[in-house]
Curated annotation (Swiss-Prot):
Function: Binds 16S rRNA, required for the assembly of 30S particles and may also be responsible for determining the conformation of the 16S rRNA at the A site.
Pfam families: Ribosomal_S14
Subunit structure: Part of the 30S ribosomal subunit. Contacts proteins S3 and S10.
Protein known as: Small ribosomal subunit protein uS14
Gene Ontology MF term list: rRNA binding; structural constituent of ribosome
Keyword line: Ribonucleoprotein, Ribosomal protein, RNA-binding, rRNA-binding
Similarity comment: family membership: Belongs to the universal ribosomal protein uS14 family.
Gene: rpsN
Entries under SUPFAM superfamilies matching the protein: Glucocorticoid receptor-like (DNA-binding domain)
GO biological process terms held by the UniProt record: translation
Organism of provenance: Nitrosomonas europaea (strain ATCC 19718 / CIP 103999 / KCTC 2705 / NBRC 14298)
InterPro entries tied to this protein: Ribosomal_uS14, Ribosomal_uS14_bac/plastid
Keyword RNA-binding set for record: yes
GO cellular component, one term: cytoplasm
């Protein structure tokens, strides 16, 4: 199990990312627009730098929903590899079967 403080920190970052997502997308679109002038891009860059660091989606970490494990997480299920295997072996995930060839 991951420490609760680490898991809660990631959840707090997720809320911050969602809060600033629209504003961030608007600013980034100005920066990526080839037709915008240099002054507009400079002011957009300043606005982007004034946003909180945790508003960047890069700072998020995928974690297992059950254990909080940061590595080996299958994003389709939101579970770590260990818990995914345990749940799949019990047959609790419809359509998921063990591979055999």
């Amino acid at each position: 199990m991951a420490k609760k403080s680490i898991v809660n920190r990631n959840l707090k970052r997720l809320k911050t990312v969602n809060k600033y997502a629209a504003r961030r997308a608007e600013i980034v679109s100005i920066l990526r627009d080839a037709g915008s002038d240099i002054e507009a891009k400079a002011s957009a860059r300043d606005l982007l730098q004034k946003l909180p660091r945790n508003a960047s989606p890069v700072r998020l970490r995928q974690r297992c929903a059950l254990t909080g494990r940061p590595r080996g997480v299958f994003s389709k299920f939101g579970l770590g590899r260990i818990k995914l295997r345990e749940i799949a072996m019990r047959g609790e995930i419809p359509g998921l079967i063990k591979a055999s060839w």
